[in-house]
Amino acid sequence: GISSLHDMESLPFTYSEDIAGFPSRFLCIPQKYVKRIVTLKTSGTSGTEKRIFFTEHDLSMTVDFFTNGFKAMVDENDRVMIMMPGNTYGSVGRIIKKSLDHLNIRNFIYGPLKNSDDAADFIAKNNINTLVAMPVQTMILSRIKKSVFLQNIKRVMLSADYVPEILIKKLKRLRTIHMHYLL
């Protein structure tokens, strides 16, 4: 058994191949308690996808985590456009929405960028001043719809993927940037 920190040395190390090859072996609860399963392909690699399981408690704790993080980023005067997937239960977009709802921040799940004209119209129509988006989407929107971006967007939270330093530098010239890696 494990009764001290020293005992932890006897446990085998977990490699990404273990999680990819045998995801259900990492479940410590009955499967009936799993509320969301996320399949992840690690950014920048061609490795095998990994399946991660979440309970209702895990999802709730994630909402709480983001609620606390957003307290430092937005206030009741902000209007946030969530450019993350949000169609399914426990999705990133819905978790962010719940977090912002807890703070009474007006927010909209827009979803991933598909059309820059539509996104720019959405920003203008809804008086959006804050984006939560993936880095590449933000870069595309800020270049193609620069005037709408400059007139409306005060801050951006870049998330869900690696953020290249060059993108941070370019966007910092335009806006306040926050970064966070999430599922």
Report the location of each language-model feature:
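Nucleotide 5′-phosphate-binding alpha/beta core
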Residues: G1-K41, G47-M61, N68
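Conserved S/T- and glycine-rich ATP-binding loop of Class I adenylate-forming
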Residues: T42-T45, V80, L131, V156
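AMP-binding/adenylate-forming
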Residues: E56-G69, R79-M139
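Short helix-loop-beta connector
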Residues: V74-D78
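Short, aromatic/basic amphipathic alpha-helical patches
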Residues: I95-L100, K146, L167-L174
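Phosphate/pyrophosphate-binding betaalpha-module
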Residues: I140-I144
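Short, conserved loop/helix-junction motifs that constitute active-site signature segments
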Residues: S147-N152
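Gly/Ser/Thr-rich phosphate-binding loop
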Residues: I153-L183
